[in-house]
C-alpha cells in the first residue's frame, strides 16, 4: 500500500492531485464536504479535507472558530496542525491517503482527467472473443476495469502464443492458460516447487487476500488449493481462519512454502513465519527462537544456503526500516545483524538477490516520497555494506519491482517511479555489476506494474521467467513468460558453436553482440577488482588508524574519569571543611553578639556611675556650704548667749 500511488496513473503532479480531488468531490463547496464524509470514515474525511486546504490555500491563516461549533473547530485544528507543509507535499499525501482508502479510485475517474498517454478508451463495441486466461487474439486485449466497463489496450510488446510455441528469446509472451485464474491482485507472493508456481495472498481493492492458487508450468493450468490451518493438534478446513496478507515473501524450502511477514488487518508485534505443507495442504505457524524482527511488509527475504536474510520493509505504523535479520532454518533461530559500513537508507518494495552464496545485493525501493536506483552489496562473511560503480545501461529509479536470478544474471521487471511504470526489463551481471536491457514493453501493460511477482522455472529444458499480476491503475492477473538468452553460459556457447541447435539461429546476431559486450566487460573486471582491492586496503588502513585513535581516546577518557573522581573527592573534603568553618564562624558570631550586648550594658553602668559621682560631688559641695553657714550663724547666737568663741 505504501507505494500504490506510484502505479495509479501516468499523471504527474499537480494533475494527479486535481484528478483525486475531483474524484472525492472536493470543489470547495459545503456540499462537497458532505459528499466526502459520505464516502470515507470521519478521520479519513477530515485528513483529506485539511490536506486539500493546505495544498490549495497554503498554511492555515483563518481565525479559530468558536467553541460552539465543534466541527469547524476540529477542521481548524487539523489544518493548523499541518503547519508550513509545502503544497506539493500536501498533494502527495492527499493522493497517498486516497489510494489507501480507495485503491480502485483511478479507473473510476472520468475520462477527462486520465492521462492521454495511457491510451485507454471506452470500448462501446462488442468485446473480442477471449480465452479462459482473459487474453484475446491479435494485438488488442479486452480488460474489465474496476467499474465493470470494458477498455481496449494496444499491446504489441507481448506476444500471445500457445504454450508449446514459447520459443522466442528475450521477448515477453503470454501463454494461453486454462482453469479458473486467480482474482487480479498485487503485492502477492509466488514460488516454484516441482514445475508448479504457487501464488498466495495479495491485495485487491485495498483488501488483503488469503487464497492459494497453483499454476502448472507444464500445461499452464490454474487450480485453487483448498487449504486448512493447523493450530497445535487441532485442524480446521476453513481457509478463512488463515491470516490474509499482502507485501509478504513466499520462499520454497524442503518441499514446503514459507510465508514471511506481510501487512495484515491485525498485525502482530513480531514478524510471523507461516509454513505450508504441500502433502497435507495445511498452513501452520512456524515456531522460532531468538528475537524476531518486528512485524512488517514490503521487506526482502533472500534464501542463502540454509538461512533467510531479511532486510528493510515497512512496519505496521508505516515507518520505513533498514534493519538486517537472519533466520537459521536448521535451528529456527533469529539473529539481528549489526553490519558495518553504510547500509541502504530505510526503504520498502525493493529487490534483493544473492551472488556466489556470499554477496547480498539490494536494488531500488522507495520511501514515502522518493524512489531509488542505488545498488548496495553486503558481504555476508564480513557483514560489511558497500556501494560500487554500476556499468552499462543503469535502470531508472523504481519501487515495487520484482527480480529473479539465473546463474550470475539478475533480471529486474516492473516497478514504478512516481510518474509511470518501468517498461524496461533489465539484467545485471552480478560478477561485473554491468546492466543491460533485455527487452521493453509499453508503460500501460501489466509488465510495467508495481507489486507483480516473478519466478524462474524450466520449460522444454530451458530456463524461463514467469511474471504474474501487478497494479498499474488497475489490478492484473495475467501470466507472461520470458525466455532469456543466458550470458552466464556464453563461454560454453563459444567453445561449442558447432553444437548450437538450429533453433538458436534466429537470435545468433543478438547473441554475438552480447558476447562482444561480455568480453569488453570482462576486460574491465580485473581493473575494477584491482581498484577495489586498493580502495579496500586504504579503507582498512584508515580503519586501523581510527581504531588506534579510538583506543587512545578511550585511555584518555579513562584517565579523565579517574582525575574527575579524585577531584570530586577533594571537592567533597573541601565542602566538609567549609561546613565546619561555617559552623565555627556561626558560633563566633553568636559570642561576638553576646559580648557586644554585655559591652553595651557596661557602657550604661559607666554612665550611671559617672552620674552618681557627679551627684555625689554636688551633694558634698552642698553639705560643705551648709556646714559653713552653720558655723557662721552659730557665733552670733553664742555671743548673744554668752558663750565664748572657740579658741584657735
Swiss-Prot record:
Main location: cytoplasm
Positions of the UniProt region annotated as Disordered: 625-648
InterPro entries per UniProt: ACBP4-6_C, Acyl-CoA-binding_protein, Acyl-CoA-binding_sf, FERM/acyl-CoA-bd_prot_sf, Kelch-typ_b-propeller, Kelch_1
Phosphoserine modification, residue list: 517
Kelch repeat windows: 196-244, 256-306, 307-357, 359-408, 409-457, 464-509
Location of this chain's protein in the cell: Cytoplasm
Swiss-Prot/TrEMBL GO biological process terms: lipid transport; response to hypoxia; response to light stimulus
Tissue occurrence: Expressed in roots, stems, leaves, flowers and siliques.
Effect of residue 94 to A: Reduction of oleoyl-CoA-binding activity
Protein family (similarity comment): Belongs to the ACBP family.
Role of this protein: Binds medium- and long-chain acyl-CoA esters with very high affinity. Can interact in vitro with oleoyl-CoA, barely with palmitoyl-CoA, but not with arachidonyl-CoA. May function as an intracellular carrier of acyl-CoA esters.
Full protein name: Acyl-CoA-binding domain-containing protein 5
Species name: Arabidopsis thaliana (Mouse-ear cress)
